Amino acid sequence: MEDLTYNTKIAVLKILNDIINADNIVKDVEVDYMNEIARSFELADNYMNEVNDLVTLQALSIISSLSVDLKEKIAQLMGNMIIIDKDINYNEVKLYNEVCDYCNIDKDFNVKDYTDFS
């Protein structure tokens, strides 16, 4: 997702961070996945400061203005975040679906879309 601006990368990480926290349980595997994405975005180690400073509504606004292709890639990242800990949580799925609805991403979470989940 090299087409993303710096602010868009922070917005994506904000939404992923919200998903991580939706079940009130933060697992190491979720943090590791988030850090892996941040590394792929080539962000500095202190990226979480900016993520935490960004309001979720601002993040949604940024994401909603992206192309359909980029939005679908972001939906895939969100889905991966939901399944990464092998625990499909209702609040995480609800947040996924709400983000997709707000940002006009034509998807609903479906575990069958994630072949790595067992």
Whereabouts are the PLM-identified features?
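Small-residue-enriched hydrophobic alpha-helices in membranes
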Residues: 1-118
